[in-house]
Structure formats: C-alpha cells, structure tokens
A protein has these predicted regions:
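Bacterial N-terminal signal peptides
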Residues: 8-17
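A cross-family phosphate/adenosyl-ligand binding-site feature
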Residues: 28, 50-107
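Structural recognition of the beta-strand scaffold that forms the well-ordered cores
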Residues: 31-35, 59-63, 94, 117-122, ...
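Solvent-exposed loop/turn segments at secondary-structure junctions
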Residues: 38-41, 65-69, 99-101, 124-129, ...
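Internal, conserved structured core segments that host functional sites
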Residues: 113-160
Length: 291
C-alpha cells in the first residue's frame, strides 16, 4: 500500500528560512533526501539510492511523479492550491510537481523535525554545465535546498552518441565517493558544506581519470531553434536543438573540461547577482535616475 498526502502550498512556501541541517548520529552516515527531475521511478536514481544505502547512508527519495526536466528552479506558489504526495513504497515518495516542489515538501514535511544532512539531485541523464544550469531542474532542486538552509549536490551524466549514457554506472559510483568524502571530512561547524553552498558535479562520457574543479561557463551547450510545422497546424513551430558552435569564453569552464573527459565539480551559491565590477559600471551609466 502507498500513502497519499495532500498538502496546501502555503506550507511549502515556508521553506525559505528553514532550520539548519542536523547531523546524523553517526558522523559518517548521512540522512539524505534524494531527488531528480526525471521522475521518482528513474532507474539511475533508484540505483544511486541503493548504492548510498549500501554505503551506510539513510536515503529517502522525494521526486516528481513524472519527468520534469528543464523547469529550472520552478516552485508552485499558488497559495491555497494542493499538491499530491504519494509514498509509493517505504522511503520512496512521488510528488505531483517540480523538483523544487519535491525538495520543499521533503524538507518541510517528511524531515520537518530534523532536516536532512544533505539533498542530492540526480544523477541526471545529460550534462548540466555553463548557462544550461539556469534551466536545469536537477540543479534547480539543489538551489531550492539552499533556500532552506540544507546543503546540496547535483549530479549529472554526460550524453553520449545516439542519446546514450555509457558512463551512468561510473557516475553513480563516483557520486557515492563524493558523498562519503563529504561525510568523512565535515569541517563547517559540523555541516557537510559551507552555508548557502551546493556542488554541481558532471561526469563525462569517456572519463580520462581526472577530476577538475571548474568555473561555471557562460555558453549554452545546446539551445533551441524553431521551424514551421504546417503538418501540425498553420501557426505551429517545431522545437529543434541548436548545438553550440564555439568554445566557452570562460577559462577552465565546466563545459570545456567536461568535453575533454574530466569529471567537473563547481561550487554554486544560488545567486544570479553580477560581480562588483559590472554593478559599478551599470550604476555609473544609470546615475541620476529618479522614479
């Protein structure tokens, strides 16, 4: 049997400002909320859960009911509406919403009395690098966790030829290594990561044996193009992929290093604020404006 819960979204909105995460009793055994944007039944997420449990961690899946890719940091704030949450089997929950909704529900309801030590999102089927993370539900779920004071790691596996993912199992094994390393080296007042910090980890198609700490690129590995689709309707357009044609302009960008076969790790803080130099330049140009 599974359990259904209908939760008003007013409760989920209180995620921001949630309590800081508590440590598990065993410092090397973490209480983990595992999510994704591919749906709770994703085989790679189920495999990661089993691998983490085998490593001694406590893992609860709280993930979207169906595929919710490319929804970014979307969160349902239609206050007064409802969300359906179903416990499909012990420790595995489906949420009729976005990855962000799943994390918000998990932190505020399932872990209400004791927040998880870590939120893990993924492993996603497809890389999440450079400007692509702005649209990623996988990374969006990790950013939602930061808003509630819970550290997070997003894992993604690069796409190979013919839409294949030959390094999926390797990426799962590496994810467990990362989690175990974080659990064994906590140094931030007992927290897994510094406040307001998430990690974005991407695993290459053909690993070269190197792990690189990368900067966040600014390019889009793939964007969208549109072509008339009169076979569907007179005003319809078909959405097509538009691959990037040039290198990322950022030195040591995650996209560049991943394409070279490196595992990439990038620290994120969830902020879209421009740096001080850009802010100063814009301020000078817009000086003396009045309402």
């Amino acid at each position: 049997m599974f359990r259904r819960i209908l939760i008003p979204f007013l409760l989920l909105a209180s995620l921001v400002g949630a309590a800081a995460p508590a440590q598990a009793k065993d410092q090397h055994s973490l209480r983990i909320l595992l999510t994704n944007d591919d749906g709770y039944s994703s085989s790679s997420t189920q495999s990661l859960r089993q691998a983490l449990i085998a490593a001694g961690h406590q893992v609860t899946i709280v993930a979207p009911l169906t595929d919710a890719s490319a929804v970014g940091t979307g969160l349902n704030i239609k206050f007064g509406s409802t969300l359906e949450a179903v416990e499909r089997s012990p420790g595995i929950w489906s949420i009729a919403g976005s990855p962000g909704d799943a994390v918000a529900f998990g932190v505020r309801v399932l872990f209400a009395s004791n927040p998880p030590d870590l939120v893990i999102s993924g492993p996603n089927a497809g890389e999440n690098v450079a400007a692509l993370i702005n649209h990623s539900g996988t990374v969006g779920a990790a950013v939602t966790a930061l808003a509630g004071g819970v550290p997070a790691v997003a894992f993604s596996t690069a796409r190979g030829p013919s839409n294949s993912f030959p390094s999926t199992q390797q990426s799962i094994d590496f994810a467990v290594k990362v989690v175990n390393k974080l659990a064994a080296t906590s140094a931030y007042n007992g927290k897994i990561l510094p406040d307001h910090t998430a990690l974005n980890v991407n695993y290459p198609v053909t690993p070269n044996g190197q792990v690189k700490f990368a900067k966040l690129g600014t390019s889009l590995p793939v964007s969208t193009d549109y072509a008339p689709a009169p076979d569907v309707c007179a005003t319809c357009y078909r959405i097509l992929p538009l691959p990037a044609t040039g290198p990322d302009p950022v030195t040591d960008a995650d996209r560049t290093l991943l394409d070279a076969g490196n595992v990439t790790i990038t620290a994120l803080d969830g902020s879209w604020e421009a740096g001080p130099a850009v802010t100063t330049l814009v301020k000078v140009r817009l000086t003396n404006l009045t309402p």
